[in-house]
Swiss-Prot record:
One of its GO terms (biological process) is translation. This is Large ribosomal subunit protein bL33. Keywords: Ribonucleoprotein, Ribosomal protein. InterPro entries: Ribosomal_bL33, Ribosomal_bL33_sf, Ribosomal_zn-bd.
Length: 60
């Protein structure tokens, strides 16, 4: 039998650079395995309001 999907959770990534500059914040949703990745995710994603790739950190 297949195991349940209770280890994978939906998280939100929010742009940090736009937040500092007071511009429109871009957000992405993705999933992560909370057993393998216990700390907060930090990914480089595209921010359409700034028109460049910026750091996006996991928020609650």
């Amino acid at each position: 039998m297949a195991k349940g999907k209770e280890n994978r959770i939906v998280i939100t990534l929010e742009c940090t650079e736009a937040k500092k500059e007071g511009k429109t914040v871009s957000r992405y949703t993705t999933t992560k395995n909370k057993k393998n990745t216990t700390d907060r995710l930090v990914l480089k994603k595209y921010n359409p309001s700034m028109q460049k790739h910026t750091l996006h950190k996991e928020i609650k």
